[in-house]
Amino acid sequence: MSETVLPSLLSKNFPETELVKLPSSLYKRLKTYLDYKDIKKIQKAYTFAFYAHAGQKRNDGSDYITHPVDVTKILLELKMDPDSICAALMHDVLEDCNVQKNNLSKIFGKDVADIIDGVSKLGKLDMQNIEERNANNLQKMALAMAKDVRVILVKLCDRLHNMRTIEHLPRKKQIQKSKETLEVYGPLALRVGMQDIRAELEDLSFKCMHPIRMEILESAIKSSSGGRKKIVDKIRKELKSHLKANDIENAAVKGREKNIYSIYNKIKRKHKPFSEILDVYGFRILVDSVDDCYRSLGIIHNYFSPIENKFKDYIAIPKTNGYQALHTSLLALNAFPIEVQIQTRSMWATANMGIAAHWGYKTKDKNQGPELRASKWLSSLIDLQKKSSNPTEFAESIKKDLDSNEVYLFSPKGEIFALKSGACLLYTSPSPET
């Protein structure tokens, strides 16, 4: 879009009567938690994007504006703040529409312009081809993310929608994007605690790269779950009944499904047949308080047989991405093995929404759980950049950091240590008493 086409739109005094009506699917969600003033600002952002992308089409032939609208819908599920919503609607205008950042800043504020600029820099990266120029872009991206974690949120939602519609790209591009998503954006979502988005990104990428394997696993899971549904339902009801009988009134007991890509990786990692991987069924217990978490643990251990060395306390010491829960494995009906995760509802929200769970419209405290941890990780990227001798070394270090898994060590004294995968453990026997 040439900026001379819509000079009036680049003015703060653009009349409200000229604003393009928001799609009803957006407006209905916005009015559930935002006020009139914020919605009007978002409507102006939509108007800007609508005219900026006028005449542009997506690969499937649809109007381009449908993409930022669908990205915004994903972000609205997280109930993000108005600036994030505005940035999502306009996230492609710098790259695709000849719009200048300083004009966005004048109209929508510096935060919105900086988020869009950060998302644009992320979009220019090719993580499969780390060369000097691309590594320089990665440095700029790390700085943008460290300044405002909302850059990551908008970009993850952008990538998720692109993966949902990836079938319209050439096959070579599909493979490239899927590989990049598995290696970069999935781990990035994990780093900031966005578990639901991470799971969908992984499954969509896996389906694109290995459609036959995906089909086989989906079919096997469907046939397997049908035969055991009665047992699972019976265990769920028993768990609920025991908790209620012991005054845990508001407990919710749900089945816990693993995403297909994680099942596939578990089969490869453990070298076990599919039937053994699915022998263990997962349940999640949601309660109101931390005290209820530990009480619930004692109750279910009293009625079912705990499996030795299968208890983990991530409430006492959370994972680095903010995840908190009690994990235990039990032998239920007829020695049927089950895995149980116990969380407060707040912990569950954090586990699924990550930094967005505490960003929300009304919560602006960046010193809370997952946001603080994400900010610390992003700040560590800046330290990494300073220690790297050149941009390429920095880019390689980031890829290794995203790819690294953590191993949690539980000591006999109940201490929990987070170690990098591959770390060596040295055991020193206690000195004899003198």
Predicted regions, residues:
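Active-site helical microenvironments for divalent-metal-assisted chemistry
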Residues: 1-282, 286-338, 343-416
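Short, contiguous acidic and Ser/Thr-rich linear segments
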Residues: 417-423
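Short, structural beta-strand-to-alpha-helix junction motif
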Residues: 41, 423-425
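Conserved small/polar residues in nucleotide/adenosyl-binding loops
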Residues: 427-434
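Alpha-helix N-cap/helix-start and coil->helix boundary motif
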Residues: 290, 425-426
